[in-house]
Amino acid sequence: GLISPFEEADASECLKIHRIRSKWSQEGRLVTESAEDLQLEPSWAYWQVNSTRYGQIGSMPVKGYFPFGAVEDTKAGVVWAAQLAIECSWQMEFYRRDDGMAFSGGLADREFGQWMKTIKPGESFTTPEAILTVCCSDERAGSTVDYACQRLTQYAQKYVNAAPESEQHLPILFNEYCTTWGLPSHENIKGILEAVKERVLNILLLTVAGLLRKVYTGAAAWVTMYHLIVFSQKVLVQSAMIFARQAVKPGIWFEIDNVGRDSHVYSEREDLMLHRDGKVLTTKERRFFDMCNPDAIAYLTDKVIGQLKK
């Protein structure tokens, strides 16, 4: 049947498809296209199937697209929207053969994601959740699709409410990376906090990427990263009184998922790395810990969490 009960026949020139594009450091670009521009209009014979399928393969669920989609009837001012609560391969699809339009989504299938699962008699399988909403325009929220997105994101409010008291509001965080280019020190932290003392600031985040670059290809091995941790802790200790005086909480930024090509872990502990087709998955100068490998988790627990606790 028709996805919009407000239109007759093929709902010509009034169905809009909303998706959200994404890539590294440029997440969240809303893309709106008409059903006609996506060639989601029926043929004269009503037998040819047309579909627009999109999604992501792997463990970065917002690479390419957000797991979100919406159809808007612009004449009626109504939006049907869906979001997947998913952190693995997923797909969504707008499908049309006749006057009706179907909107589906979930785990990536055999065609799109090279994945399938056989459920034997007596077995069960639980899929990730999908959050659905339908709404009309709302003056307070602006456009209809904005209001639909607001309704979808409010689904997670219950998880926010269950968080610690310190996370019941959105803290104002300052990342000093572009101020010191990853080489924080007691002196420049003092200068930063002096410069923002008239502002409300909750967290100052230290990024030691500059020191990381000096030993870059080996630093991410987390044995040599010990020195980065010690360096960061030393800066924090030196600046502790300044943080306390201005009631600002310090934080340290680390990326623990990869190793550099000159680190001994890169070549000596391939058993901890992600593999594909029997070989270690390797990019230009990095390899990646297999976060499903208990030995990799134990290694990181010791080298990162253990050293931070010290």
Predicted ranges, named:
Residues S166-P171, C178-S185, I252, I256-K309:
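Active-site-adjacent "subsite" loops/lids of carbohydrate-active enzymes
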Residues A85-E87, L132, F174-T179, V208-L211, ...:
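Active-site beta-loop-alpha junctions enriched in small/polar residues
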Residues G1-R97, G113-W115:
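Polysaccharide-binding surfaces and accessory modules of carbohydrate-active proteins
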